[in-house]
Structure formats: structure tokens, C-alpha cells
């Protein structure tokens, strides 16, 4: 259920291209694509064998409540945590496509002249010919694409992907949501109903980025790791609800998130500019970056989380 990404190809809206290669980085894979149902099943199995973890179906009193319900978190709103949102003029369409040609463990991305961004992520399966798709497009185009019959939708996607994987067939339902960059002003606080207890945000409940870099889940996992380290390293006498601990976690994660947020937003802004000088500049920049050596290696390590 986990598919290695051994190559990554990013194509601009003219002739700019960037290639990443796992072998060049000395690693077996640049990333791993995991099916959500498989990941959820494994997590459920793991929880069953953790005697200190109990699954509950209703709120229970606790010294610390970790709020990780997603970007539309109701609990975050009830706690009064302000969430600064900068909407993008795009909606994401997510689905799966069966491809005539095998994906070859290559992740592909296309930037179009109209600002649309199409990403193919390789999935496991017979023949290696299924990809997960995220297509970021303007809201009117999203509505148009979602209204198409399956065959017509596949033809539009085949054209947008320049026929890289041959004939495409829709292999799942289509989902859509509006895109935004967002971050909570404060990630932790005291529970209004219990001054001795605290809350803390993690994952999409704390921050959102554009999916063009494919880092959303990784950033959330980074939150979980950082929070576990801060709490696990506390003095024995200190409660997990100590706001000094939780603010340390908040500072660490905000610092870690800043470069990725700036890079993601910067790329989106650059490729959403009108054609003309901007189109020439960004494609020239892609070609220069592809031959930049140390800079390209540094960016690859950042994306892989190896730094």
C-alpha cells in the first residue's frame, strides 16, 4: 500500500522543467505515497496494542486536549482560537485515474498558463498504472470539470497532462474543496471549563498550505512528533497542561513551518501571474534551478525532511 517515488518531474507553463532523482540524493525514494484507507487501518491496528490508549466516542476530561480535527475544526472555533485565512482563487479536485501507461514511480506536476496546477502521484496496484490526482483550478473551471461525464473529464485531464501516461480513465469519485493558506494566531491555551486543563492545536486545525508541494500530511506529522518530544522531555513534576511547554511546541512549529509556507505561497503567486514577462521569468528560473546543484539538493532534502 506504500508506493516509492523515485523520480519527480515538474513542468512549467512554457519550456521550464525541474527533475528530482532519488539516486542523485543517495536515497531509495524521494517520498512514499500511502493509501489513506491503508494508513487508517494500520493506525487502528497499532492503537489496539497500546494499553495506554483508549478510543472514546465522546469528550472526556483530560489534562490536555489536542485539537486535530482538520481545517474546519469546530473545537478550535468553540475555544475562540483565531484562524487567519488567506483564500486562494482556486479549488482542488481530487480523484484517482487509471492510466494506459505505467507511472514508473514518478510523481508529475504541470503548471498551466491559466494558473492551474495538476499533480499525479503514483499509487500501488496491478501494473503500477493508477495515480492519485490533485488538480488546482479556478472555481468556475472546477464547477465545469465536476459537471462533466467521466469520459469527458478524463479527456480534459489527459490534455492537461500532455498525454504523459496515455489514455486516462476515472477510477474513483471526485472530491473538491476551496484552497487557502491559514494559520492559528495562538496554538494553545487554557480550557474555559477547567483552568487546570489546556488545549493545543495540531495538523490542519493549526495551519493550511496550498497542496502544490504535497507537504500537508508531512507538516501534520511533524506537529505530532514535535509535541510528543516536548511533552516526553518535560520534568516529572511538570504537567502536560503547562502552557510554557505548549508554547515551546508552538514556537518550534511556527519556525519550522515558515520556510515551507513562504515557498509554497511564493510558487503559487509566481505561476498565477499573467503571461508575458512573468511567464518567461518563471520558466527561465525553473531551468536555472534544475542546474543549480547545491541549491537543488538543499530543496530536495527540505522536502524529504532530512535537512
Feature map (PLM): residue ranges:
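Short strand-connecting beta-turns/loops that link adjacent beta-strands
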Residues: 13-15, 25, 102, 125-128, ...
